[in-house]
Regions:
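Compact alpha/beta protein-protein interaction domains typified by the UBC
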Residues: 1-66
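Generic signature of intrinsically disordered, low-complexity segments enriched in small/polar residues
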Residues: 6-9, 16-18, 29-31, 46-50, ...
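Glycine-centered motif in EGF-like
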Residues: 37-101
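Charge-rich (especially acidic), low-complexity segments
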Residues: 91-135
């Protein structure tokens, strides 16, 4: 099922790029709202295909890039990739729904709904996310 205009919490992305301009790793996280600082709170990613901060792209092939500014369009590309149940666990949200149930429940909510009713504190900070990306 394709969900058009699906609401999302605030996401941050990290990319590892090889010397030959291949994207070798993608990190994805959920931050708190407001001004971001190294101490900004991170939340458990509520959907599938992410473990800790690491995105599993499965058989999806990430594009090669010619310059770093091309990374700007990569979040859209990633969010359009097909999802499955890989790495999905019901206990990653306060709602404890199966994946299809979660998507159906969230499809008409706004982004703030995540912070009030869905997200669980990861007990990590944005600085932890940046450190993971830098490894």
């Amino acid at each position: 099922t394709e969900y058009k205009d699906f609401p999302l919490p605030r996401l941050v992305f990290g990319f590892s790029v090889s010397a030959d301009n291949l994207i070798t790793d993608v990190q994805l996280g959920v931050t708190e709202t407001g001004r971001l600082t190294p101490k900004s709170k991170m939340f458990i990613y509520p959907f599938s295909n992410v473990e800790e901060f690491r995105l599993c792209t499965g058989s999806n092939v990430l594009p090669s890039i010619k310059s770093l500014h091309q990374l700007n369009g990569l979040p859209y590309f990633i969010l359009k990739m097909p999802n499955n149940y890989d790495y999905y666990k019901e206990e990653r949200t306060k709602l404890n729904l199966d994946y299809r149930g979660l998507l159906e429940h969230l499809k008409d909510k706004d982004s703030q709904y995540y912070y009030d009713n869905v997200l669980i504190d990861m007990e990590k900070t944005l600085n932890d996310f940046i450190t993971e990306v830098s490894k």
